[in-house]
Amino acid sequence: MKLAAVVMLALLSGCAAMQGSAERTQASTMDIIAAAAAAAPEGVVGEYQLSIQAAGTDGRAVYLNTELDYRDQRNITIAMSPAVAAALAGTDTASAQQYFVGKKLLVKGLARRMKIDFLSHGKPTGLYYYQTHIRVKNPEQITLLSDRAA
């Protein structure tokens, strides 16, 4: 019984250490997702190696995704303004989306678990899911590691 209490205390201490703005470098998307969920709602600051499989926009932001389906629970979304995307790609916003697909990036920023509401006629339905997002505010947060996503 005492051993169980010690193990539980150690686990809780480890979880507490993951919260906040601890700097970490992680290559596995599942590690990043787990760390962001454990630190929610604050998130985890770090440098993350991510392979981009898909991209999209809603007009207000450009989204780079590590999975083909952005709703996949294994996906991490990098969100940035169209201006930042165009500056990084050296082209217009429409071309910038496709510039990143198939590339491996080093992204510096805060990985946060975000609640995404399902909408009906523009209003939340009460149903939701979570995504992990890294918001990029300036081009210096992204470094191209490879032209091929490994």
Residue ranges and their predicted role:
Residues 4-12:
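Sec-dependent N-terminal signal peptides
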